[in-house]
């Protein structure tokens, strides 16, 4: 762990948001003009957190910081074995439970079917599949490569998770303006479903940061968990009622984790500088 580096969270998040939002809103405007998605703008938008992290590392950090970053990507020995089952199975099991609860309350049982296609971008199956895998990896190289640690150098883990959860949610804003995107479809169904998207990120941030710091800041583990977040949401024909229940269950689990690990979440700082 890098203990003698002064993190610059404000600079980092301004860079990450600027890169993502500039390119993201360009795509949003083009999508309403009938222009095909420009893969360069799309990649730059999703790579905002990672590009910002690279800028911070090469402008403000030394070789030891960069070596630590590389180690946290590739070194699987950072991962504690007892966290692997939770990482792999928690999200899909929670989604199935959410669907079952919704069925009890009258929602269609067809939700338990495997989805015929992924719905990140309607009608663009291959692009959606790539995004489901590639984007979580690119995000986590930035968020856990620099962003979350920069917040954890200033705040305890609970405040870090709450602040990051809000920032992470707002970071997705351009997607809500892209025609045929999953996020834009939420508004069309009901504003509550769009609100649920943002609310659900908060407990997710708590759970992910807990895993991250319990596993010696392994970027690999959190990237895998993030990929499973996306796949669990798209694997079944789950409707938005089930996804609201999913958010509720995530919140319950996040609260339990915080209560059972109070000293871990409320110690002064996760990273001393």
Q: Residue locations for each model-derived region?
A:
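Membrane-interface helix/loop boundary segments of multi-pass membrane proteins
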Residues: 138-170, 213-218
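Alpha-helical transmembrane segments and their helix-entry boundary regions
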Residues: 9-13, 83-84, 146, 160-161, ...
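Membrane-interface interhelical connector segments
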Residues: 142-149, 178-189
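Transmembrane alpha-helix/helix-exit interface in multi-pass inner-membrane proteins
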Residues: 95-103, 140, 159-181
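Specific transmembrane helices
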Residues: 2-136, 164, 196, 234-273
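Hydrophobic/aromatic residues in alpha-helical transmembrane segments
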Residues: 97, 147, 204-208
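Functionally important transmembrane alpha-helices
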Residues: 186-251
